[in-house]
Regions:
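Histidine-acidic metal/acid-base catalytic patches
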Residues: 2-60, 194-216, 220-303
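Active-site acidic/histidine proton-transfer and metal-coordination neighborhood
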Residues: 10-19, 27-31, 51, 89, ...
Length: 303
């Protein structure tokens, strides 16, 4: 065999071998992750099937111990209970569902002065208490609606704080926490009030309640402001929850520009024991995409 042909054949064999799962890799499949990464329904349906309990069981079998479901509050009560029972059996911790935000992004509920809209926001948060208790959730997402183009931002901030204090008073006796999620203007949600970390920090300091904290979505904040680790550090004492997604594309870590291994290593070093929601899609379809997602989290959790 010619020397050139030998090296070509050797290289092809090495590539093929690397693509196969090794025996050493197999035990890591069910090993818990170092951080509390929380998938959502649909991410594993190619490998686990469409039944939600089967997806929970599959997630637990490959090492996930947390879950989130934005629309949990919209599911039938018997389905909520079925999922809660399955999570308890599997040792899965429930993350966020949306208490206020779905269908309300365009409303001036928190930044306006309409009493009806403001009272409605409080009642939606109140209605979430029973859902949280049923599914053993501690955190719920709140998005404080639209930016008010007719009012100075400082006045909007004050109005937002006032209304969030009312919501916090409803949640505090139950030990529940609403997490405020800043959302980016440039790719997904132009015109929303809460968009940057310093804003969310200012608002939470103003509300001054253990029931009002920040949901730091790494995808959104990379687009809106960048400077991820320093901003996380600055707002650390008000952050209760994280979500992930790479940019551009909002797919699994490793498909974009964010150094997720370093970000997650930083969270772990700071002692974060909460949830990192996997609020993103997959870069590949079918069972291959499901497995690529698992592999991506194993890779960025390797620190």
């Amino acid at each position: 065999m010619k020397r050139r042909d030998f090296f070509a054949a050797a290289g092809a064999a090495a590539t093929a071998a690397a693509a196969l799962p090794s025996a050493a890799d197999e035990p890591t499949q069910g090993k818990p992750f170092q951080l509390g990464y929380a998938p959502h329904f649909g991410l594993f349906e190619n490998l686990a099937g469409k039944d939600h309990v089967k997806q929970l069981e599959f997630a637990a079998s490959v090492g996930f111990r947390d879950w989130e479901d934005n629309t949990m509050h919209m599911r039938p009560l018997d389905e909520q209970q079925r999922l809660a029972d399955a999570m308890e059996r599997l040792g899965i911790r429930m993350g966020v569902f949306v208490a206020y935000g779905i269908g309300s992004f365009g409303k001036l509920s928190f930044t306006g002065s309409d009493k009806k809209l403001r009272d409605q926001a409080v009642e939606e948060v109140r209605a979430s208490i029973e859902v949280a208790k049923r599914v053993n959730a501690k955190w719920m997402t709140v998005v404080p609606g639209a930016f008010n183009n007719r009012v100075e931002e400082g006045f909007q901030t004050a109005r937002c704080i006032d209304l969030l204090r009312r919501c916090a008073e409803v949640l505090e006796p139950h030990g529940l926490v609403m997490v405020l999620e800043p959302l980016n203007w440039w790719a997904n949600h132009p015109g929303l009030f809460l968009r940057e970390t310093h804003q969310a920090y200012e608002v939470c300091r103003g509300v001054d309640s253990p029931s009002c904290k920040i949901l730091f979505d790494i995808y959104h904040q990379q687009i809106q402001e960048g400077n991820l680790i320093p901003n996380i550090d600055m707002a650390w004492d008000e952050i209760a929850y994280f979500q992930a997604g790479d940019n551009p594309g909002r797919k699994e870590p490793g498909t974009g520009e964010i150094n997720y291994r370093n970000v997650f290593k930083h969270l772990h070093k700071k002692g974060f024991e909460g949830i990192v929601g996997m609020e993103h899609g997959k870069s590949l379809g079918g069972a291959e995409g499901d497995q690529a997602l698992i592999d991506a989290y194993r890779a960025v959790d390797d620190f």
